[in-house]
């Protein structure tokens, strides 16, 4: 079974018990573009039904899938907000630049 299918099966198994919160740790790590796209669609389909806590090192993934984002460094919370709020606070229109700003400045 491919990595993409393994992740989909794992998420499906977790959803069987109808959790209120779903924790996804780096869910697209190592996936190809098509598998990632399919998984993103699945995650988006859960919005409004399940609270999802997702960890990722991919800024485009955080921005595309998140209503609110917490930026952490070494276990310390640097900032939290919507992607738009974080970009505005950093004075940029790119989320990756907002992330870099937060990490370099130690806050956002």
Mark where each language-model region is.
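ABC transporter nucleotide-binding domains
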Residues: 1-73, 77-79
């Amino acid at each position: 079974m491919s990595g993409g299918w393994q992740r989909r099966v794992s998420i499906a198994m977790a959803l069987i018990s109808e959790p209120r919160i779903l924790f996804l740790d780096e869910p697209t790590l190592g996936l190809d573009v098509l598998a990632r796209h399919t998984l993103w669609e699945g995650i988006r389909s859960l919005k409004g039904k399940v609270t999802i806590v997702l960890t990722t090192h991919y800024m485009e993934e955080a921005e595309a899938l998140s209503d609110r984002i917490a930026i952490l460094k070494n276990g310390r919370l640097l900032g939290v907000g919507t992607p738009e709020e974080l970009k505005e606070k950093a004075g940029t229109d790119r989320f990756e630049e907002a992330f870099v700003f937060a990490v370099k400045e130690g806050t956002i």
